[in-house]
C-alpha cells in the first residue's frame, strides 16, 4: 500500500519583510524552508504580493526527494533577474508540483539584540496548475 503524501501543493505566507539594514556580521533576511518527503523532485514556484504594486512572479527552486531546501528570499531572483525589494511589506505564494511542507523564518539584525521569528506557512490546498 502506498504511503500517504505529507504536505500540500499550495502554501501562503501573508507576512514577509526584508529589512534594509543589518547590524554586525549576520545579515537580516528571510528564508522559506521547503521539506519534500515524497519520491519525486518538487519544482517550487514563488510569487510575491505587495500592498501598492503588481505581484512579482517567476521565482523558482527545486527540492530533491527526501530533502529540504532553504530559499533565502534576499538572494532570490526571478526569470527576469528581479529580486524582492527590501523595506517593503509583502506576502508569498508557494506552489509545488508535489506535496511539500513549508516553514518561513525571519532573521532581523537591524539592532544588536537579534530577533529570530519562524512560523509554519498556511497550507492553502491544491495548486490549480
Residue ranges with predicted function:
Residues 1-129:
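Gly/Pro-rich, tryptophan- and cysteine-flecked surface segments typical
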Amino acid at each position: 500500500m502506498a504511503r500517504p503524501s505529507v504536505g500540500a501543493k499550495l502554501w501562503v505566507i501573508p507576512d514577509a519583510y526584508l529589512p534594509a539594514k543589518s547590524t554586525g556580521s549576520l545579515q537580516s533576511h528571510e528564508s522559506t524552508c521547503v521539506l519534500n518527503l515524497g519520491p519525486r523532485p518538487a519544482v517550487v514556484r514563488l510569487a510575491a504580493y505587495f500592498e501598492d504594486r503588481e505581484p512579482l512572479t517567476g521565482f523558482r527552486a527545486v527540492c530533491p526527494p527526501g530533502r529540504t531546501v532553504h530559499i533565502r528570499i534576499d538572494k532570490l531572483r526571478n526569470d527576469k533577474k528581479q529580486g524582492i525589494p527590501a523595506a517593503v511589506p509583502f506576502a508569498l505564494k508557494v506552489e509545488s508540483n508535489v506535496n511539500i511542507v513549508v516553514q518561513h523564518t525571519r532573521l532581523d539584525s537591524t539592532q544588536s539584540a537579534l530577533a529570530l521569528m519562524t512560523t509554519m506557512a498556511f497550507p492553502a490546498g491544491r495548486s490549480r496548475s
